From Swiss-Prot:
Compositionally biased spans, kind Low complexity: 371-392, 467-495
Residue numbers of N-acetylmethionine PTMs: 1
Organism: Mus musculus
Protein name, as recorded: Cyclin-dependent kinase 19
Xref: Pfam families: Pkinase
Biological process terms in GO annotation: cellular response to lipopolysaccharide; positive regulation of apoptotic process
Major subcellular site: cytoplasm
Residues that hold ATP according to the record: 27-35, 52
Length: 501
């Protein structure tokens, strides 16, 4: 071995501590890493970055999978991995992301706190529409490229703060993401428990063997309902959960209490679910005879004949084969009536949400959100805390929470052809359709709020990712700022949550 050459390479290798200023700027902490708010020391740009240090030495298989995916995925609504640093001296791994100041978990918490303080301030409906549109746009891109996210929840949906991408949604935490083209084995054989419980589709709870893109759509429906009501639609107590068993009685009970028990005609294949015998044994259809999504949403002043409710109903369809797709949802009439969705979800208004607080290096890990079990994700990305939102009057400041970090999840590495080819961005037909005589403010082609549509901004790809993934069984974990996964407390009105990147 040429030790002189090796020493020369080590001297020339870029080191995180030489390039970025991040001391005292920790914004997240978790089981699998720390997240720092960072700036370049050389002043080449004034951008803020999220710098995630993965705990331990070396790089895990799950980290390899997330890094491989993130290096390939390029879309305005998917968090951008800027660079990976490998420290050969201490074998640390650092991931550099764009910094997002907010996430939906903190935004929703802000509005929930206003209700608790007797000064209710709902999320503006125009903001809800813009958030949902951009989430669907990002997921449509992932699905078009044969990627399932599999862990969508408010903490994994970041929103950019002040800057060039102000108010832009970023889907984060790809630690559980999976390529689903020609899997070698049924996905359920590899990691049977996927997606945080409150956002888990009923087919997963019933042990579906070959689940599909529909699991992400159900989770988006849950997020949509939470944006409309400021409460998790399917929250339930989640104690003593056996994560190796997909069936969870309390979670199914909560879903049926809101939606009603599915009729045979509404979900014909429910009898084929592996856990259907358990369902028959533990549940009685008559218990939920008076339950329906219509009644639940009417309590929150959402009319059953409104376009917002009709889209929610399509997203939360029990039968996954009848559930709407992301492409269909993007063309739903809900997005074609005023106010049209905007690229800046804050619509140019002042952002009332507080910025993320810095954590002390010796500050103990936050105790909140321990009661919401989820799959372990040994590697994840930091999400941004909630900060400022749209124009509504300033609500009383909620309890401030600090971001936590977690690792990445699951296990698959990039193999085969590697990530070099990149994604081909071809415009999907039909997604630029808007109502007659209406000028779109945002679309799959994206544009500045109120400005002309620029097709290059929001292009979708139907090409597959140019590499294969070998999958290991995924273990459960917490996550980092929207750049990873985190847990929510059953006391959802007062708990803190970690963020993801």
């Amino acid at each position: 071995m040429d030790y002189d050459f090796k020493a020369k390479l080590a001297a020339e290798r870029e080191r995180v501590e030489d390039l970025f200023e991040y001391e005292g700027c920790k914004v997240g902490r978790g089981t699998y890493g720390h997240v720092y708010k960072a700036r370049r020391k050389d002043g080449k740009d004034e951008k803020e970055y999220a710098l995630k240090q993965i705990e331990g030495t070396g790089i895990s298989m799950s980290a390899c999978r997330e890094i491989a995916l993130l290096r390939e995925l390029k879309h305005p609504n998917v968090i951008a991995l800027q660079k990976v640093f490998l420290s050969h001296s201490d074998r640390k791994v650092w991931l550099l992301f764009d910094y997002a100041e907010h996430d939906l978990w903190h935004i929703i918490k802000f509005h929930r706190a206003s209700k608790a303080n007797k000064k209710p301030m709902q999320l503006p409906r125009s903001m809800v529409k813009s958030l949902l549109y951009q989430i669907l746009d990002g997921i449509h891109y992932l699905h078009a490229n044969w990627v399932l996210h599999r862990d969508l929840k408010p903490a994994n949906i970041l929103v950019m703060g002040e800057g060039p991408e102000r108010g832009r949604v970023k889907i984060a935490d790809m630690g559980f993401a999976r390529l689903f083209n020609s899997p070698l084995k049924p996905l359920a054989d590899l990691d049977p428990v996927v997606v945080t419980f409150w956002y888990r589709a009923p087919e997963l709870l019933l042990g579906a063997r070959h689940y599909t893109k529909a699991i992400d759509i159900w989770a988006i429906g849950c997020i949509f309902a939470e944006l409309l009501t400021s409460e998790p639609i399917f929250h339930c107590r989640q104690e003593d959960i056996k994560t190796s068993n997909p069936f969870h009685h309390d979670q199914l009970d909560r879903i049926f209490s809101v939606m009603g028990f599915p009729a045979d005609k509404d979900w014909e294949d429910i009898r084929k679910m592996p856990e259907y015998p358990t369902l028959q044994k533990d549940f009685r259809r008559t218990t939920y005879a008076n339950s329906s999504l219509i009644k639940y949403m009417e309590k929150h002043k959402v009319k059953p004949d409104s376009k917002v409710f009709l889209l929610l109903q399509k997203l939360l369809t029990m039968d996954p084969t009848k559930r709407i797709t992301s492409e269909q949802a993007l063309q739903d009439p809900y997005f074609q009536e005023d106010p049209l969705p905007t690229l800046d979800v804050f619509a140019g208004c002042q952002i009332p949400y507080p910025k993320r607080e810095f954590l002390n290096e010796d500050e103990p890990e936050e105790k909140g959100d321990k009661n919401q079990p989820q799959q372990q994700n040994p590697h994840q990305q930091p999400a941004a805390p909630a900060q400022q939102t749209a124009a509504p009057p300033q609500a009383p400041p909620p309890q401030q929470s600090s971001a936590q970090t977690n690792g990445t999840a699951g296990g698959a590495t990039a193999g085969g052809g590697g990530a070099g080819a990149g994604l081909q961005h071809s415009q999907d037909p039909g997604l630029n359709q808007v109502p007659p005589n209406k000028k779109p403010r945002i679309g799959p082609s994206g544009a500045n709020s109120g400005g002309p549509v620029m097709p290059s901004d929001y292009q979708h790809s139907s090409s597959r990712l140019n590499y294969q993934s070998s999958v290991q069984g995924s273990s459960q974990s917490q996550s980092t700022l929207g750049y990873s996964s985190s847990q929510q407390s059953t006391q959802y009105h007062s708990s803190h949550q970690t963020h993801r990147y």
